[in-house]
A protein has these predicted regions:
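SAM-dependent transferase fold signal centered on methyltransferase-like domains
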Residues: 1-279
Length: 279
């Protein structure tokens, strides 16, 4: 989608922002210059999901409160927009892959405890898992950029949908990661589900059943202790987000604050009070 068109629509829609939404999405001038929370989302009812075409990262903050979330969004987008980080990532791109040009932070409709950082333009081919993995690794060894003080986790998101369209989301995301295969040695996988201010609660059992049905029986098997692949599913506000990653536990569940400042990674999943334990 044309970002210039999106920006023009943003300007046109701004005067019609609902008063309640305007209040909920207010940030100070200091932050608005750095993180332009997408106004094309601000007037949408809280139950509307993130646009399905957005690719990026689910971001949580070290501290609670909207101010902390905004600061975390600033940090996450600044890391992704860092010149040297983009140079380092571009060096590992596949030939013909379209890179992202910038990272843009926005609220997740219906959830003010977390944020979303989208990679633009929307038709980029960036591997969000590789980006998040690189950030964790750089934080562990001490990157040139300022170490994160506000971001807790930066979880890759390949695609999102309404919370009621989980089945369609899994059908869209998983086939490229789990193609049919007849190898005698199965590839292991697990499913991790968590909730943050969900509009509706879903049990991990139900999510595992729906998502797991889109992984072929032949050539794959569930391993909850040491899976090669982890299907990450995040339910925040009215949005269901999904990605497939490797080494989820080894990467500390993408907690970059912990990677930067703590030597020993915890086995618990960081997040808000409503987050469910890993499956």
């Amino acid at each position: 989608r044309d970002d210039a068109r999106d920006d023009a629509e943003d300007e046109a829609s701004a005067p019609h922002i609902h008063a309640r939404a305007r209040s909920r999405l207010f940030i100070s001038d200091e932050y608005s210059r750095t993180v332009r929370l997408s106004e094309d989302l601000s007037y949408v009812q809280p139950t509307a999901p993130l646009p399905s075409w957005l690719k990026g990262f689910f971001v949580t903050a070290v501290s609670k409160g909207q101010d902390s979330v905004v600061q975390a969004a600033i940090e996450a987008s600044n890391i992704l927009n860092d010149y040297w980080f983009k140079v380092a990532y571009d060096a590992h791109r596949i030939d013909g892959e379209k890179p992202y040009e910038r990272a843009k932070a926005m609220w997740i409709p219906g959830c003010d405890a977390c944020a979303f950082v989208a990679l633009r333009p929307d038709d980029n081919d960036a591997n969000v898992y590789m980006c998040a993995k690189a950030i964790v690794e750089e934080c562990r060894k001490g990157a040139d950029w300022k170490q994160p003080t506000h971001v807790a986790r930066i979880v890759p998101v390949e695609k999102s949908s309404s919370e009621l369209e989980l089945d369609a989301l899994a059908r869209d995301v998983l086939p490229k990661h789990f193609p049919p295969r007849g190898d005698s040695e199965p590839i292991t996988f697990g499913i991790h589900y968590e909730e943050h201010s969900p509009m509706r609660h879903f049990s991990s059992t139900d999510v595992n059943r729906v998502v797991g049905s889109h992984v072929p029986d032949e050539g794959y098997k569930v391993d909850l202790k040491n899976p090669r692949f982890t299907i990450c599913v995040v339910n925040a506000g009215g949005s269901m987000m999904m990605s497939v990653v490797e080494a989820y536990d080894a990467l500390g569940h993408f907690n970059i604050h912990r990677a930067a400042f703590e030597d020993k990674l915890s086995d618990t999943v960081p997040g808000d009070d409503s987050a469910q334990p890993a499956a």
